Amino acid sequence: MNRLPIRFEQVEGGIILLAASALYFILGNNPWLFFLLFFTPDLSFAGYLVNPRVGAVAYNLVHTLSLPLILIALGLTSQSLLFLGSFGLIWVAHIGLDRMVGYGLKYPDGFTHTTMGWIGKDKGKN
């Protein structure tokens, strides 16, 4: 299996993580809030308690850039909505970390089957 596209995605994830984090802190946002909310998107794992399909949909919904970019755009529209942009940056940074370490979007057959290959106990299936 040619892993070069996956490596590119991992490097891109690292750049996204660094850029979103840097922008968050350059804008003078609260560091404690960043660390407190950084793993909030992983609450979507709770969907796996229902079944793998629901888990994959929940995980994928909060691990794509669409929703956090909407929050960032809303945060740019008004001073009173600035906190939404800050949360969006934290969310984007989290997604970047996941991609950097090889966690892609999930397939409905199980948590370990991702768009970037198999992870965890199933990693050898690549």
Identify the residue ranges that each predicted region occupies:
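N-terminal membrane-targeting hydrophobic helices
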Residues: 1-126
